[in-house]
Amino acid sequence: MKKFPKKLLPIAVLSSIAFSSLASGSVPEASAQEKKKGNQDEIKNVIVLIGDGMGVSYTSAYRYLKDNKKTKVVEPTAFDQYLVGQQTTYPDDPEQNVTDSAAAATAMSAGIKTYNNAIAVDNDGSEAKTVLEAAKEKGKATGLVATSEITHATPASFGSHDHSRKNMNSIADDYFDEMVNGKHKIDVLLGGGKSNFDRKDRNLIKEFKKAGYSYVDDRKDMLKNKDSQVLGLFADGGLPKKIDRTKDIPSLKDMTNTAIKKLNKDKDGFFLMVEGSQIDWAGHDNDIVGAMSEMEDFEQAYKAAIDFAKKDKHTLVVATADHSTGGYSIGADGIYNWFSEPIKAAKRTPDFMAEKIADGADVEKTLKTYIDQKKLALTKAEIQSVEEAAKSKEVLDIDNAIENIFNKRSHTGWTTGGHTGEDVPVYAYGPSSETFAGQIDNTEIAKNVFKALQYNIKINDK
């Protein structure tokens, strides 16, 4: 394995560029042409991408994971070129000062601090206007894309209002019932959460179809659909992680490109929020395999947004995280190494393998089927640890045992199964990208997007 010290100079250079950006309030320049596009052209479209749980340790580990071992340098990821700063994430909660996804998303959608669990409402329970609603008021097309349920905390905080993120059925109702200028306020909805739309008390899928929306539930139908308004639900709950996904379930890149293609038909432009939801879920699970799988899914969607913006020349792209998750560390137990090869050996997530074993599959056969033995040759002790966990027949016990193998072999550390409160990176490209530079607060994401939309609003951010 190549040692990191041989390859750190380019990363240091990138970091120094980013640091100078923070100090000066400027954005790293890819070229004079891109600078012209970023600073002089009017904004027609805004794309906000949120890597849920994606702290700096995740973006750093992903860089090392994707590194080309044949070179002497650590190659940058798609994110690195457009790093402009970092943001604080704390909520305005009477009992907690580490944010959840709802409070953080509300900060980024509405520009206000609020309590954990709040969906675009303030501490008094009053609804706060979101940037998606502002875009719709300006006549733009709007969309939400996520790998979680589309009613989960982050997308919900852009497209609905509720005192609790747990009310996912009510959030689904809001997506249909709440109008802006007499129109449904979200034109494209792509993600999971079918169970929140197809219920005994209400069938929102039928209602959306009656209102003129297309409905799709697999990748093939989504890609061939020609309509500008579409509801796409590809799982009852969240989508499988990228590494576990079958061909009939779209990737985050697929959904992002589909949303952009449909929304871009609107002559007045569009607003789109895209969430890589399950970076966070993997972090909660202390699952490094799942985390890196979801980082790749998110990077590909991010690249799709950037590629569109470069061609369009009137699109602002902002990418960030709502918080970090798991207290993830690159290196653990006092060992000064971190190895990506064990992670690359996985063909499926520990969750996937654990469910197979809990259903009665042979432990050793399952592990060796879904873990490349050339990259990670399992020891007898490692196999026995999973066999011991399997005696309980509990998926969680088996999952933890398999995750422990990957964590130990890669020297990955975790401190919690919850969120952590550090600042998170901010990336931006296109017109007004410089407004996101430096040390900012997460509420400034929304405030700057409102400005980009030329929407005048007085935000009560007491």
From Swiss-Prot:
Q: What is this protein called?
A: Alkaline phosphatase 3
User: Sorted alphabetically, which keywords does the UniProt record give?
Assistant: Hydrolase, Magnesium, Metal-binding, Phosphoprotein, Signal, Zinc
List the EC numbers from the record: 3.1.3.1
Q: Which residues bind Zn(2+) 1?
A: 280, 284, 419
Q: Does the keyword Zinc apply?
A: yes
Residue positions binding Mg(2+) = 52, 154, 275
Describe the family membership recorded for this protein in Swiss-Prot or TrEMBL.
Answer: Belongs to the alkaline phosphatase family.
Q: Which residues form the signal peptide?
A: 1-32
Originating organism: Bacillus subtilis (strain 168)
How is the cofactor bound here?
Binds 1 Mg(2+) ion. Binds 2 Zn(2+) ions.
For this protein, the record's CDD domains field holds: ALP (cd16012)
> Could you give the subunit structure recorded for this chain?
Monomer.
Cofactor names from the entry are: Mg(2+); Zn(2+)
Q: Which reaction does it catalyse?
A: a phosphate monoester + H2O = an alcohol + phosphate
The enzyme class is hydrolase
Q: Which residues bind Zn(2+) 2?
A: 52, 322-323
